[in-house]
């Protein structure tokens, strides 16, 4: 990232229709606009012309670029694949809660428009194999393949912002320590109510707390760029390259983070989907990260 990009026009834009709950000290001003073409060479760039994904329960000698499990509780644990209270992250190699034959549901597909994650409602028999979850969906992470301390992270996505019960997310979590010991950045997530939620979760005060910003979403299923600029002093959230809000960087944000893309369905926050719904999708055209200028 070139220094001049971050040193021009530092005046902060107020969140566009947003609501802010920030920490005790105000964050330093961030650039109102970020243009990816001016950021220099990225540290990570994925356009999904190939989809290098696999389970990678533990770190292999040659990790896949995208990991399809969370790594919580071991390979046979529900927590290893849980996305929400109603949905489980599966892949073509998932053998079910009974560790039997492959369940046979692949939520991932690629094409000219990048990666599509499709959540599917399953029948009662399949629910048993999904630890009781009603929906089979997907999640991918860069754990083992990419992590970074500070920088600008961006995903170009088509999200079901206004589809009831849909819970897609692009987020960052630390590579070390139990969640959320060193924080979590949601950049962003949506829950089907037409809003976009940007959140920094922290335990810097010895308890789980969050700095939260809400902005309007787009219900037309168009492509948008969702980004987060993470600096030692400030975190800024960007929608199509424009700053929509910022918060102070919590003191416990000291470890490199890796990226997660997932599509949850239902749960206590978004609520259940429409009973008639059988399929929900999110599309991701590009995921890119740049380091901070030295």
Question: In which residue ranges do the predicted regions lie?
Answer:
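Bacterial N-terminal signal peptides that target proteins for export
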Residues: 1-7
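Bacterial N-terminal signal peptides
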Residues: 8-15
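Boundary at the C-terminal end of the N-terminal hydrophobic targeting segment
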Residues: 18-22
């Amino acid at each position: 990232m070139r220094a001049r990009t971050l040193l021009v026009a530092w005046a902060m834009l107020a969140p566009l229709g947003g609501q802010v709950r920030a920490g005790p000290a105000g964050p330093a001003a961030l650039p109102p606009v970020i243009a990816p073409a001016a950021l220099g060479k990225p540290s990570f760039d994925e356009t999904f012309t190939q989809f290098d994904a696999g389970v990678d329960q533990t770190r292999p000698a040659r990790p896949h670029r995208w990991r399809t499990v969370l790594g919580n509780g071991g390979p046979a644990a529900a927590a290893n694949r849980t996305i929400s209270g109603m949905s489980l992250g599966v892949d073509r190699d998932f053998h079910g809660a009974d560790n039997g034959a492959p369940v046979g549901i692949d939520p991932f597909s690629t094409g000219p428009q990048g990666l599509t994650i499709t959540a599917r409602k399953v029948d009662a028999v399949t629910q048993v194999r999904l630890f009781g979850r009603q929906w089979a969906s997907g999640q991918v992470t860069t754990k083992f393949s990419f992590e970074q301390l500070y920088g600008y992270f961006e995903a170009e996505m088509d999200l079901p912002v206004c589809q009831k019960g849909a819970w897609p997310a692009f987020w960052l979590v630390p590579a070390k320590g139990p969640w959320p010991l060193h924080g979590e950045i949601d950049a962003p997530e949506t829950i089907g109510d037409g809003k976009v939620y940007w959140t920094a979760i922290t335990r810097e005060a010895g308890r789980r707390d969050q700095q939260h910003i809400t902005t309007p979403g787009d219900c037309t299923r168009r492509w948008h760029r969702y980004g987060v600029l993470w600096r030692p002093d400030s975190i800024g959230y960007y929608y199509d390259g424009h700053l929509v809000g910022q918060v102070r960087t919590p003191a416990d944000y000291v470890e490199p983070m890796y990226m997660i893309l997932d599509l949850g369905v239902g749960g206590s926050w978004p609520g259940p989907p429409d009973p008639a719904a059988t399929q929900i999708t999110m599309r991701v055209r590009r995921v890119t990260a740049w380091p901070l200028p030295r």
